[in-house]
């Protein structure tokens, strides 16, 4: 997992043989997860990557760009100008397990506070409701969904809430997973 603020840790206990094989990682060694994709370092590279993805998919699939909640106005603007179809803004309440507790609990902007600047960016570009806006990070209840939609999101994304609903409310390490 990644945080919107830097590197995420993937601890050796999380890297089972199956995960090591899927991700081509050595088992038994703590790993760092980069906060950005190595194929781009700026907005021009993002546009190139989006075009590359469009070619690979024959222009038949929507391109989603997920941004952390650090600079929602500017990152939404960049993603729209680069050609994204859908922008997912992930606020600080997202349920990552791959970083230190101090980051999980104290760093980033609250999810709903990220929404208004992202909507404003879309409105300023004349793209609100043209480019879809999805908000994620700590959306747990119907009231959270209603607030997000009322503030201008087209959809919400849930993660931890769905896991809890499925009975996974006691996260623990499973040696045989």
Regions from the PLM with identified roles:
Residues 34-177:
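Glycine-rich phosphate/ribose-binding loops and adjacent secondary-structure elements
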Residues 16-19:
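ATP-dependent carboxylate/acyl-activation modules
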Residues 1-7, 11:
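Single conserved hydrophobic/aromatic residue that forms the stacking wall/gate
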